[in-house]
């Protein structure tokens, strides 16, 4: 079903047995995908520039990352996966197993419609959270501002936070918190891109914009870059994540809860 939903041909596979490695009733499923694109149509940091808009696409839930943390919280609170949780409107197990939203067709359609002049980069928010993944598609010297107050954090994330007594810093460094995909686009087409995503049935909103530090090392409205990573007001500057030296993401504002 996932291959059909994303337009991906399934060209091969195998069922391998590993005696002595896995228990008789255990199984593991793994897959890999390969894509091909013309060099002239590659998206990435070299297309991102000052003034670009940073657009969020809503996640469907936890997606496929952070389950080590989630399992520890479930164990800590002693919750049954079959128990009904009022704030979810369904059982805990059903909420935790909500399928990961697939963005492939939507992202391809946006590039087809707006071209590489309009769509500059995509960032899939996986392990490490929003800022760690977004920073990797930004060029060095560039900062993307992200306003935490621009969306309401889905209930499942606050359940994990409260149940595990996890700080918001720990949460945003581990889980997607409601943002599954980010598009960095030309400001000139931002409103049209937003409309197209929403028309496709995926909630979208502007997270922030792309800027650069001034010659004096300051970011307009936030002060010195060198002092932001330890700002007591909740402002965080994140860069150099996952072994990639690229741009940076400046998180500010407070999360909204439903």
Regions found by a protein language model. Name each.
Residues 1-6, 22-27, 87-97, 101-258:
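Glycine-/charge-enriched secondary-structure boundary and capping motifs
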């Amino acid at each position: 079903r996932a291959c059909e939903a994303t337009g991906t041909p399934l060209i091969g596979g195998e069922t391998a047995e590993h005696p002595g490695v896995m228990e008789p009733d255990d199984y593991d499923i793994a897959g890999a995908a390969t894509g091909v694109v013309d060099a002239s149509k590659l998206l990435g940091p070299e297309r991102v520039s000052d003034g670009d808009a940073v657009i969020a696409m809503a996640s469907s839930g936890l997606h496929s990352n952070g389950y080590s943390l989630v399992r520890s919280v479930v164990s800590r609170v002693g919750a049954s996966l079959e128990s009904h949780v009022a704030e979810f409107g369904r059982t805990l197990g059903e909420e935790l197993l909500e399928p990961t939203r697939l963005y492939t067709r939507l992202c391809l359609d946006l590039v087809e419609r707006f071209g590489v002049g309009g769509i500059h980069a995509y960032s899939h928010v996986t392990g490490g959270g929003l800022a760690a993944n977004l920073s990797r598609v930004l060029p060095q010297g560039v900062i993307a501002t992200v306003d935490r107050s621009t969306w309401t954090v889905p209930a499942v994330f606050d359940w994990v936070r409260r149940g595990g007594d996890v700080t918001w810093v720990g949460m945003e460094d581990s889980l997607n918190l409601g943002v599954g995909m980010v598009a960095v686009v030309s400001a000139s087409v931002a409103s049209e891109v937003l409309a197209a995503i929403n028309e496709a049935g995926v909630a979208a909103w502007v997270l922030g914009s792309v800027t650069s530090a001034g010659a004096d090392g300051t970011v307009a409205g936030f002060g010195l870059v060198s002092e932001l990573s330890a700002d007591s007001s909740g402002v965080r500057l994140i860069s150099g994540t996952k072994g990639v030296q690229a741009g940076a993401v400046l998180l500010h504002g407070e999360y909204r809860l439903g």
